[in-house]
Swiss-Prot record:
The lineage of its organism: Bacteria, Pseudomonadati, Pseudomonadota, Betaproteobacteria, Neisseriales. This protein binds to 23S rRNA in the presence of protein L20. The keyword RNA-binding applies. One of its GO terms (molecular function) is rRNA binding. Signal peptide: none annotated. Keywords: Ribonucleoprotein, Ribosomal protein, RNA-binding, rRNA-binding. This is Large ribosomal subunit protein bL21. GO terms for cellular component: cytoplasm; ribonucleoprotein complex; ribosome. It comes from Neisseria meningitidis serogroup B (strain ATCC BAA-335 / MC58). One of its GO terms (biological process) is translation. Disulfide bonds: none annotated. Part of the 50S ribosomal subunit. Contacts protein L20. Belongs to the bacterial ribosomal protein bL21 family. It holds the Pfam family Ribosomal_L21p.
C-alpha cells in the first residue's frame, strides 16, 4: 500500500515505515502530524485518485528530526566589470516517518 501526498509544495510517494525529508514543518520532535492533502492511494488492485485530493484520506507521520541541508554555493559574475558575488544557502528540513495510511 502506498499513497501520494503533497506537503511543502512538493509531492511524495510514501508507504508505511518509510522515512523521508520534507520542507520544514513547525512541529515538536516525536509528535504525530497528519498530512491531509492526499492525491492518490493504491492498495493492491484498487487505486483511488482525488480531484485534486481524496476526501477523508489522511497519512499519519511522526516527526523524527529537524535539520539543515547541504550548502548550495551561488557565484555571480559579470565579465570585464570586476563584479563578483558569492552567496550560500542551506534549506531547513524536517525528517518524518510514515506511521499509517488511512
Amino acid at each position: 500500500m502506498y499513497a501520494v501526498v503533497k506537503t511543502g509544495g512538493k509531492q511524495y510517494k510514501v508507504s508505511v515505515g518509510e522515512k523521508l525529508k520534507v520542507e520544514q514543518i513547525p512541529a515538536e520532535l516525536d509528535s504525530q502530524i497528519e498530512l491531509t492533502e492526499v492525491l492518490m492511494i493504491a492498495d493492491g488492485e484498487s487505486v483511488k485518485v482525488g480531484a485534486p485530493f481524496i476526501e477523508g484520506a489522511k497519512v499519519t507521520a511522526k516527526v523524527v528530526a529537524h535539520g539543515r541541508g547541504e550548502k548550495v554555493r551561488i557565484f555571480k559574475m559579470r565579465r570585464r566589470k570586476h563584479y563578483q558575488k558569492r552567496q550560500g544557502h542551506r534549506q531547513n528540513f524536517t525528517q518524518i516517518e510514515i506511521v499509517a495510511i488511512a
